[in-house]
Amino acid sequence: MLGVIADIHGNAWAFEAVVADAYHRGVSEFVDLGDVLYGPLAPKKTFELLRQIKLVAQVQGNQDRLILKGPGTPTLDWVRCDLGEEPLSWLAALPSIATYGDCLLCHGTPYSDTTYLLEDVSAGFARVRSEHEIENLLGSTEAPRILCGHSHVQRMVRLTSGRTIVNPGSVGVPAYDDDAPVRHVMESFSPHADTRQLKAPQSLFITSSMTGTLQR
């Protein structure tokens, strides 16, 4: 069985829980849809955990790209320092799109890692795109199954053409707000796709978003 993961954002503890649950449910191999290591929690530990699973395909996300090429900020400087040379070289080698079987993997759309494939946020909230909009964003892509991330929202859309698009949501950051391309909020909810949402133990929470300090 194949597990689809996306948007871990350096949250190693959430990643551990998701992988454990996946193994319990019979998952034996994974594909990852990007934005793996960016975030002020535990990027190096996340990288080490990722190397322990059977990862059969992976793509680079927009914030993976930011780690490699973005301007210096306190968070980026800390992430780069925590990761070191090997994870950065590994990250740089990831493709922007990939295929696995009859699935096409991308972070945002097949042509942009910063565009939401299934949601329009021009009004400040997530509106599910029309089929016409989705088809336009897919362009010449012919894969019968498209796996995407970026929005952090679990969603599955079946097109009248017979194609299926699945966003598994985010392992590490299930909801967030952003100001690009406009100010908007992304919220998680129960999807129609066969996905999983896990609740963290109450005894474990983050007390510092910059250092990832844990309070037990």
Outline where the language-model segments fall:
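Core catalytic region of metal-dependent phosphoesterases/phosphodiesterases
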Residues: 3-92
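Active-site-proximal beta-strand elements of phosphoester/diester hydrolases
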Residues: 1-9, 102-111, 165-169
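His/acidic metal-ligating clusters that form di-metal
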Residues: 25-26, 85-156
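Active-site environment of divalent metal-dependent phosphoester hydrolases
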Residues: 9-14, 38-41, 64-69, 111-113, ...
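Generic structural signal for secondary-structure transition and capping sites
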Residues: 55-58, 96, 103, 213
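Glycine-rich, phosphate-binding/catalytic loops in enzymes
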Residues: 21-22, 47-50, 75, 122-123, ...
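Structural motif
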Residues: 57, 104, 145, 163-165
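Acidic, His/Gly-rich catalytic cores of divalent-metal-dependent hydrolytic chemistry
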Residues: 158-216
